Amino acid sequence: HDALPIYGFHGTSHRFVSARCADVMGEDIKKLKIVTCHLGNGSSITAVKYGKCIDTSMGLTPLDGEIMGTRTGSIDPSAVLYIMKKEGKTPDEMSNLLNKKSGILGVSGLSSDDRDVKVAAAEGNKRAKLARDMQIYEIKKYIGSYTAAMDGVDAIVFTGGIGENSAYIREKTMAYLPHFGFNLDKEKNNTLKRGTEGRIDAGAGPQIWVIPTDEEGRIAKETEHVVEQLSREANAAIA
């Protein structure tokens, strides 16, 4: 059988924020180890070592990885087969369940929107709190595993709708990672939201950044690069 590829997703976002992180740090990206966390209704986390992605949480499809708004994230394949047999679901029905009715929505029983779940958890809804706790647990698990995979880390980047706007998710995630040297500045963290870029660590250990993604800008630059390259090749052929 042909091997199945690991595509990964949000590649344009991860490339943009990792490059931007190197710029604001004043360092060559080829000398840095960065974990980029694109957190939104769909989420993925990537290990960028010396400018190259060496691992990413999403795989063949966007279903893999940490728990998301309506997606399960990583799940035991046998659990899928068990549910299909027990409930008599077709492959299409199972795909719909895993992709559109699970994740934060399925656990909370309320919504896939982080803002709704945040309010419900604050009001004492146990399922909403569980959904947020599961989300935080899985984010920190990926950060920890990628830090180990790269033999260390120089910076963490949060981006995406939740990554840029949820000070709570950032704080609770980093609070469980002090053994890696992370030291979050809570005051700085609480001031960054709604598209604001900034550094939120206390100045010791690996840096922690919030960097708004610009996928359209990155695509425009990549397109410009390709057009320039094609133009040079055409001119060389004419000459």
Descriptions of predicted regions:
Residues 12-34:
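Conserved phosphate-binding catalytic cores of ATP/NTP-utilizing and phosphoryl-transfer enzymes
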Residues 35-42, 48-49, 159, 211-212:
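Short beta-strand segments
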Residues 2-4:
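Short, small-residue-biased leader/transition segments that mark boundaries at the very start
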Residues 96, 103-107, 114-149:
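Adenine-nucleotide phosphate-binding core of ATP-dependent small-molecule kinases
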Residues 28-34, 91-95, 107-112, 148-154, ...:
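Flexible, glycine/charged-enriched surface loops at secondary-structure junctions
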Residues 8-12, 16, 43, 74-79, ...:
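Conserved active-site and cofactor/substrate-binding residues in soluble primary-metabolism enzymes
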Residues 39-119:
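Conserved ATP-utilizing enzyme core subdomain
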Residues 129, 133-157, 163-235:
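Internal helix-turn-beta structural module
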